[in-house]
Amino acid sequence: GPPDCLPAGGAARSGPCKKNDSLSEAFDHLLEGLAPGFCSPEDFARARTQWLAGLLNLGRHTVTGALSTAGAKHRDWSAQYRLLQRLPVDSAFAYVQREALAATDATRPWVVALDDSITRKTGRCIPGCGWRKDPLGPHFNLNFVWGQRVLQFCAAIPSADGSARLVPVDWQEAPLPKKPSLHADAQTLQAYVEARKQANINKVAIERMAHLRTATKRPIHWVSDGRFTNRTLLRQLPENTVLIGRVRKDTKLYAPCQEQPGKILFLMMRRPPRSTPEQLRTDDTV
């Protein structure tokens, strides 16, 4: 039968909505831009229902909660769950990236923040899940949570007052390979070590940076914490991009290396450090 749908635009409302009409119409206009990426109008209608119900849901933000909010609690959910297996994720994020670029000044660099996080889960059969260090745990005690490791990129949309809000423009799951048993053979252990290297969060970030680099010809300024301010990522930044990252205050900063004929390059790495970030911060002459 036809998919369960919430009313489009301002249809079938019970009372005055004041500014809600324009808000819902604007949101519907944004959703309509995602329609070409779906295989059929029915799939788009089901996805639209879940998105709108997710905004109205006052309970847990799950598929069950969204469908219950949409009034489909006692109906067959098979089509709704099968939809999640064929969502056009790449085309959806491409549309969001275009909208985020259009909302910023085309003459200025595109500012994109990146960070890794843990999405907590409860099911033990969800792919990519494992025990991870709790980023919100106290510093004096190591806590573990069950969830997925993900990498998210958010574009900064400036406001009139000088502040900015972040809009997600890319999302990538970054699972770690399962560690083999103690009795595994050497070939299995070697394969695990190689898979662990490929699953490094910095390598995943480099791949997604290269993907976002194709979204625009404008310069891109990446903003990150200290996790991504390292040699692995800095040496493989995409063309016409800049990374603004956090570092420790006692980090040793060196002058750029200058090649000299007849000199061995690694000897120049022994030059003394110029200063540290803390010294630069407290130096009034800088």
Listing of model-derived features with the role each one plays in the protein:
Residues 1-25, 29:
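Intrinsically disordered, low-complexity and often Lys/Arg-enriched segments
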Residues 19-82:
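Gly/serine-rich nucleotide phosphate-binding loop at the start of the catalytic core
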Residues 57, 118-120, 226-230:
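Gly/Ser/Thr-rich loops at beta-strand to alpha-helix junctions
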Residues 73-82, 136-219:
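Electropositive, glycine- and tryptophan-enriched low-complexity nucleic-acid-binding patches
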Residues 86-175, 284:
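Active-site-proximal, Lys/Arg-enriched surface segment
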Residues 121-127, 163-168, 180-184, 234-235, ...:
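Short, conserved acidic/polar surface loops in the N-terminal third of protein domains
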Residues 186-286:
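An internal, acidic/charged active-site-proximal segment
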